[in-house]
Structures are given as C-alpha cells and as structure tokens.
C-alpha cells in the first residue's frame, strides 16, 4: 500500500523534548508513538555482536517500538536493512538538508516514506552538491545521535530489560 501524500514535506516540523525543528518527509505520526527508542550501536562490533544487536532491536520493533537513528554504524545499517525488509517503524535522521523543490529522500527511504513505515527527518536545511558530497563530520554524527536521543521516549537501558 502506497501513501503518496506522505511525500509532502513538512517544514519547521518540531518534535522531541527540546522542540528541535526539522524538515520532515514520511509518516509524521511515528513521533507520536508511545515507545520510541534511540538505536545507537558502537562502530567496532564483531559480526556476532552485530547479529545480536539486529535480533535485539528487531524484536523490540516487532513489539511496536519505533526505532530512531541516523543509522550510521555498520550495526545500525544492518538493523536498518532488517527493519526495512519487515517494514518496521523507523525514524531516519539524515545528514543532508531536504529543503528545495525537488529534494526528497532517495531510494529505500523514499519507498519507506510512501509505504508509511518511515519518517525521514533532516535537521539541516541546506542542500547543495557541496553538502551532499561532503564527508560527514564527527560533530554532525554526535549532533544526529543527540537528535535521536531527544526524540526517543525510552532510554536505552530501559529497553534492554
């Protein structure tokens, strides 16, 4: 089932405890779910540890928890793949702006938005060939993880029990 209306951009979309402003595309109701969990995994996990993280977070998402993350580390990317395959609810925070008439999420993010199980949030307004090609900085990574923590309603430790 496709929901083309979910491709309508929402500018100045405020959410989270701090009320940060984003450009949003997708299912904006996902930030209203009672259980939203920041998904953050260390970059240097082994294959076995990554598989354990995938199983853990997918089990939570199957139970109705919305996964909130920039999906940057290899483990987070693996969780994104598994959640996408099962069409589980996700909020994807991206490091590029979505402002501009023809700037939209691409690939699977676009499909996830139109299918209703994904919300893409862009905390940065600008989008240009320069910013699109620029390598993400550590500061941006920390900021995006901070945005995910702000949107989450469940602390990481609570979800592990």
Residue ranges of predicted features:
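Glycine-biased, small-residue-rich flexible motifs in mid-sequence functional cores and linkers
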Residues: 1-161
């Amino acid at each position: 089932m496709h929901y083309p209306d979910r491709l309508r951009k929402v500018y100045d979309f405020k959410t989270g405890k701090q009320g940060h402003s984003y450009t949003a595309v997708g299912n904006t109701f996902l930030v209203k779910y009672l259980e939203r969990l920041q998904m953050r995994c260390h970059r240097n996990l082994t294959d076995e540890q990554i598989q354990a993280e995938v199983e853990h977070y997918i089990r939570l998402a199957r139970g109705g928890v919305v996964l909130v993350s920039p999906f940057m580390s290899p483990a987070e990317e693996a969780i994104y793949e598994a959640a996408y395959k099962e069409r589980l609810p996700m909020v994807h925070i991206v490091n590029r702006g979505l402002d501009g008439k023809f700037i939209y999420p691409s690939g699977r993010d676009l499909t996830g938005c139109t299918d209703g199980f994904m919300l893409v949030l862009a905390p940065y307004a600008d989008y240009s060939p320069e910013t699109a090609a620029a390598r993400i900085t550590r500061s941006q990574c920390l900021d995006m993880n901070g945005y995910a923590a702000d949107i989450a309603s469940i602390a990481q430790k609570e979800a592990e029990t």
